[in-house]
Amino acid sequence: DVAPSRGLGDVYKRQVVDVQPKEVSIALLEDKQLVELQSEGRNISFSVGNMYLGRVKKLMPGLNACFVDVGYEKDAFLHYLDLGPQFNSLEKYVKQTLSDKKKLPQITKATILPDLEKDGTVANTLKVGQEVVVQIVKEPISTKGPRLTSEISFAGRYLVLIPFNDKVSVSQKIKSSEERARLKQLLMSIKPKNFGVIVRTVAEGKRVAELDGELKVLLKHWEDAVTKIQKATKFPTLIYEETSRAVGLLRDLFNPSFENIHVNDEAVFHEIKDYVTLIAPDRAGIVKLYKGQLPIYDNFGITKQIKSSFGKTVSYKSGAYLIIEPVS
């Protein structure tokens, strides 16, 4: 584990992760200066990305939709068009998985059934009491339960894995046609049959080892989810939980040029270390558990910078400062 060598003009970058009971926030420091701050709430058990083996509670033919019990106090909403084109294949696979408790059916050997008809109806596709695999696309708000899809996917930093699909599509934001062709060809050669992949913008220029490493992790998420379906004894049941808020935030902000990532919570420290080990094995040593007496943001001078940024006077690196006052 060697930190990237720095020249004289290079900036010392570190991330500081503050984990609190209701919130996790990540500060990015460049030479001790706070340059970015992101925070998200925690403990939302019905988070976007979570997958459930739910049960159809009520059909709503007028809306061409149904309500599904996923364990939330209010039933979740699933529209026919959100069942996804591959619903028939997924449904058949789930039935096989539930009926054979010893052996998992291999998705790579599954026969992909024709796409779901675009102008079909929920009443001809689902029945009350039926088990369905669903993923949350919109978290519950006030009087409404979560919004669902059955077009399930597993998102990583570079790739999104879509079971029962065979296409590889590359983010439109990658402009170079050579790079798009390279990524497409690369993914076609390493992905298993009957899995589709979306290549995200940040995959541009990445080596096969990094992409293959993440693909393996996403495939493992799928296997774990299917194993939970097979072992399910009660419905609804959670089969896949989107990565913790801290890892999710880090996934979008991570850069191998960071020299240290400091975390003040042991469980989150292990999650982040596992994630970094996975995508940049030679950088795993940069993740450090903070055990100091002072709150972590106080220790790194972040609290003071946050207060000054949100206060009346904002100081600049150059020595200038800005005074912000409400207009009377």
Which residues does each PLM region occupy?
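DE-rich acidic low-complexity regions and acidic surface loops
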Residues: 5, 9-328
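Short, well-ordered junction/capping motifs at the entry into regular secondary structure
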Residues: 1-2
